[in-house]
Amino acid sequence: MPRLLRGVFCVVEIFHKYAIEDGGNQATLTRTELRQLLEGEIGDFLQPHVFHAVERKLNLLNFDRDGTISFEEFVLAIFSLLNPSYFDISLLNSEPRLMSKSEKIDAVDLGAIGGNIQQVVGVGPTQERLIFPSEMASSGQPSNEEGEVGDEPMVSPCEDIKTHSLPRNVSEPNDPENQQPKEDAQEVAQNVPATEYDGVQFKRNTVVEVPKQSTSPTQEIPRERSKPSRRLSDTKISDHMIQRPTEDEEHTSTTQDPFLQKRDKATGSENTDLSVVAATRKSSQTQEIFEPMDDTKLSEAQETGKDAGRIPPETNLEEPKADAKVAESHGLPAQEREHNTRDQSVQSRSRNVSETSSRGEQEGEWKEHERITLSPTADAETQDEKCQEFPGSWRENDAKKDSAAKDPSSEEGNQNLPEIKEDSVSGKEARHSEEDTVYAFEINKNSPAAEETLETRERSQELAPLEKQSQRKKHRATRIQDKPVRKEDHNEGEDSELSLTQSDEGFCEIPNSLAPEVGKSSSEIAEPHVPEDSQSQIDHHGDAKQESHTNNPDPQKQGAPGESSREQEAVVLSIQEDGQLPEGQEQSARDGLHDGLSSRTKGGPGAAVEPSEGEEVQEATAGRENRKALEAESLEAQ
């Protein structure tokens, strides 16, 4: 109202201004000019029907019928205009005051059910209908009554027809978890006021159609963040909502059940530990399983075409263990495999938690597994070395191959040894060598030289690439010669003993491949080849010996018997590579080597080196003399 009055005063002043401009005391305006003035000044406050009323009033104001309105007539017209304006303003102020109660009730109802309103499929969000003034008094009451009783909302007959045509089941009829709340059956109304001239008021209703609550508690409450899914039951496709707990419910569950959560965490940690243990157990089992399977395949490939009695009892120490491991691998139950698979799936989910602990446990088990695996293989290698000290025995190479195949860790120690092809040996030599093997094993049982063979083999592995580059053509003889030289750099006090031991080992392997091959004639071998090969081998040995003297400050302790034995071995190996010798020459060379070695051991550095071809000594007697000399040398070194 104050704004309207200010607008009226502005109009009066403008009217007076126009009148002054016209000149004279009587200022006049036409009806058109006055209407334009009123619309421009106070048209924002007035409705269009007010201006129609002003035109009728202006016709009455033109008393003199001259078509102009004087200032006095204008003042009367203005105050006559204020009557309908005041009436409209009073209606605008009074009608919201009447509807405020219902609006407050609707606001309360909407706040109560705001989180649970779900629109029904097929029902429009808004519906318009006519409400007469008799219905206005009761417009705010049905929602309140429906909120208390929970009955079906009041709608017109037309809306009843539309509602009955819709599916009445919003959710699945057999869901025992949820119920429809009472506040869902609400009618939200917003009344737009109309003037008294119209006589009819328009009411815009936002109706949320919710079916009547069924007697059986089988309805489910639709909630936010829920996933819609469809089910087909009793030939009716209905939409239902899968309930998810809200944040309040999750908070209450966490506050009410702390003991259950602690129990769940404890069980989760136990499951994680079990998964870690199962995974490490499985990894250790697979590592133990794969090696024996490969070993058995290699041993089967090597044993093809051989007699069962050829293998001595010392070389079969690892086979029962490998067979037991293979049987264990094939005997794993299916349930344990499934359990390991499930444990791996659990472990992948808890990898960030158990990664550190699982690595530590796996490393510990792997180290223990290597320690257990290497302990029997070291014993087997020691026994193989003891058996190799006897010259002429043909089973040591077979035992060495079997032990290398059964333990991949001992493969490094055996890679520098020469690969000697086994030929057929007569039955008499086999029986003779077997008896000497047993005798040698009993004598050398407590000898310190047998204990250091493994260390010698590891020492020889480090310098193997240098020897291969210098002697690619005759690598077998080079490896046999360089072993005592490399051992001389390791320990000064044990040089003579170890050189003799390695000489015996190399000599043990030489007669195995000196048997004559079928289809080749001995006349094809030329004797001048022997001095050339022996000279080349001796020259190379001199270079290697010179290198060992530079590394060892005390050359007096370098074994002279080792030098003579290496020279003789070079001669025999050169004969072996260039061709085949008759059995007589082979036996004489072998006897010469034994006699030279024994004479060098007993007589000192000045003893003769050349072998005597006239002597014919039995192989076992030479072996016994050689072992006695070796024992005497080892006692002197100690």
Curated annotation (Swiss-Prot):
Q: Which Pfam families match?
A: S_100
> Which segments show compositional bias classed as Polar residues?
166-179, 343-357
UniProt-listed CDD domains: S-100
Report the SMART domains cross-referenced here.
S_100
- Renumbered to this chain, the Basic and acidic residues biased-composition regions fall at 221-246, 294-309, 318-328, 358-372, 395-409, 419-435, 479-490, 526-548, 622-631
Which domain of life does this protein belong to? Eukaryota
Name the Gene Ontology molecular function terms of this record.
calcium ion binding; transition metal ion binding
User: What InterPro entries does the annotation carry?
Assistant: EF-hand-dom_pair, EF_hand_dom, S-100_dom, S100_Ca-bd_sub, TCHHL1
Q: Where is this region: Disordered?
A: 134-638
- Tell me where the transmembrane regions lie: none
Query: What region holds the EF-hand domain?
Result: 49-84
Q: Which family does it belong to?
A: Belongs to the S-100 family.
Recorded protein name is: Trichohyalin-like protein 1
The organism encoding this protein is: Mus musculus (Mouse)
